[in-house]
């Protein structure tokens, strides 16, 4: 037997041995490396502990997730009741044209100059992010993201084989955009884009015109994509203007905007979003992924189209409610010894620093080992909004999406918890 044959015989026996061992010990094939490095949601990973707390009869105040309690507009339910179709057929892969036309008119109200041809309806804003990354990023490509950032950006980047390069903002600066030089330092031949969320989730920060201009100049200088998540545009509280990426002149073809009806119409379960771009090549590529998933939800599109006609007084009432909740929560947090949070300018979240050793442990402890008069609080550990594992250890994200009476109770319970938490630092 020559050397090559001996090598083949050895390798074949090795493989046979491996198969026999797997069968003997009932070892299943391994999951993908992509799946193994996919981060858990900091928003949802504590749900099992929350469920167990509720089973014990504990009232859980949910400040962990952006699920508004404001009733969905009546026009949405009216549209649902009026559906009289005989067949719930596929819609076009890019969405119903009448919905895209109405979305374009809606965007015009915000000085966003697009047509229905620039709009692709997606199954939630998350699919818009996912399809954009799959269409624009190759494995090993890099995107620069200000952090803390919505955790699903990293998850979808991993799915595309891309790498998130973070630029860290700080609570001391109110989570303002870091110096643009920090972005430029990270640019390499593999850098394909910058991603922003404006107004920001999780911090509530609202980017200024000056900050947006600096991003524009960098995008133009290096010919990058500008991915812009703008689902919270309705929620800007300080009088400062909302600046869309589409307001930035000279980079119109670089901009890919993400949108959703989930937050502005309180329709998180509808799963209707949009990807908006003037870049025809990107749209054509995105459409391939849209065709592979066939169509966005038909019923959801019908309801979303009707929701665009939500009365202005509904929107104003909702806006005023969030203004009050924001002030109530921020004032209440900053009155608790050792707690600090800046004033968020938009969205309905804030990131707070707590006098604790580890936010992940604290948030789990609240649900598994603590209750005050049958109540506890659920929050999102901020570590999950950073790429680096050592950041956000003493920070949490809170969503002011419950009524003020419950916010007051949640704040009181949080104060009591911090007084007895074994890992408190003051």
Where are the model-predicted features located?
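Basic nucleic-acid-binding alpha-helical/helix-turn surface characteristic of O6-alkylguanine DNA
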Residues: 86
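Conserved N-terminal alpha-helix of the aminotransferase class I/II PLP-enzyme fold
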Residues: 90-123
């Amino acid at each position: 037997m020559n050397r090559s044959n001996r090598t083949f015989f050895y390798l074949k026996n090795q493989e046979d041995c491996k198969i026999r061992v797997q069968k003997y010990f009932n070892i299943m094939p391994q999951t993908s490396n992509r799946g193994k490095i996919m981060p858990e949601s900091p928003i949802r990973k504590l749900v099992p502990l929350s469920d167990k707390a509720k089973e014990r009869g504990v009232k859980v105040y949910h400040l962990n997730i952006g699920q508004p309690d404001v009733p969905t507009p009546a026009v949405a339910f009216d549209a649902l009741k009026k559906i009289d179709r005989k067949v719930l057929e596929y819609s076009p892969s890019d969405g119903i044209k009448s919905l895209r036309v109405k979305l374009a008119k809606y965007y015009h109200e915000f000085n966003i100059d697009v047509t229905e041809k620039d709009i692709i309806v997606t199954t939630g804003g998350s699919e818009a992010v996912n399809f954009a990354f799959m269409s624009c990023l190759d494995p090993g490509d890099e995107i620069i993201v200000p952090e803390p950032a919505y955790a699903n950006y990293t998850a979808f980047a991993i799915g595309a084989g891309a790498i998130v390069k973070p630029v860290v903002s700080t609570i001391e600066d109110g989570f303002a955009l870091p110096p643009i030089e920090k972005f430029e330092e990270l640019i390499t031949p593999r850098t394909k884009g910058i991603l922003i969320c404006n107004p920001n989730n999780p911090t509530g920060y609202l980017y200024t015109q000056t900050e947006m201009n600096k991003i524009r100049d960098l995008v133009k200088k290096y010919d990058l994509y500008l991915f812009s998540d703008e689902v919270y545009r309705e929620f800007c509280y300080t009088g400062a203007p909302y600046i869309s990426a589409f307001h930035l002149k000279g980079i119109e073809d670089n901009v890919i905007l993400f949108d959703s009806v989930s937050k502005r119409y309180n329709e998180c379960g509808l799963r209707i979003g949009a990807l908006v771009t003037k870049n025809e090549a990107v749209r054509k590529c995105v459409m391939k992924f849209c065709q592979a998933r066939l169509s966005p939800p038909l019923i959801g599109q019908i309801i979303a189209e009707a929701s665009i006609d939500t009365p202005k007084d509904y929107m104003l009432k909702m806006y005023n409610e969030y203004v009050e909740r924001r002030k109530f929560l921020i004032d209440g947090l900053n009155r608790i010894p050792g707690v600090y949070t800046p004033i968020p300018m938009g969205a309905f979240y804030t990131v707070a620093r707590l006098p604790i050793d580890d936010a992940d442990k604290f948030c789990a402890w609240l649900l598994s080992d603590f209750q005050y008069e049958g109540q506890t609080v659920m929050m999102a550990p901020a570590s999950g909004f950073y790429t680096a594992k050592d950041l956000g250890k003493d920070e949490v994200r809170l969503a002011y999406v419950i009524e003020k009476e419950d916010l007051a109770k949640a704040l009181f319970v949080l104060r009591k918890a911090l007084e007895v938490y074994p890992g408190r630092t003051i």
